[in-house]
Amino acid sequence: MVTLAPEQLTAAQSLCHRDRLQAPPGTLPLASVLYLFDDPPLGGTHFFRPILEKAPLTQLLIDSNRMEAEAFFQHYRLSRGYMTDSNAYFEKVLTVPARYNRMIVYPGMKFHSGDISRPEALTENPLTGRLTFNGFFTGSMA
């Protein structure tokens, strides 16, 4: 469940992310999200394309986990909070709206983030909050 207020997020949590899954050669790591809430404004999933080349992108991701949060935000000129739009480092390319019992499946290496544009609606109550089930699979590339 997503429950944190934007000001509680770490630097890494304020960026989109990809699921670093190990997969045997010739297979594709897949990730999934099953939306278990019936309140679409709690948000679906955004997908992003990195704008940076590989080396600076890697450094951004490393720094988001190693630097003190405020130093990271100041250095990269980013704000603490849920990533809901494009920035200088990532372009938002797709949003999949939430719908009760909808499952999305996507390549695990695609950058993504929850569409948390109404964080004031988040709650720790699984009956009314943004409850999801996340799964990870390996698919054949044949």
Question: Where are these predicted regions, by residue range?
Answer:
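Short N-terminal edge-element motif at the start of the domain
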Residues: 1-8
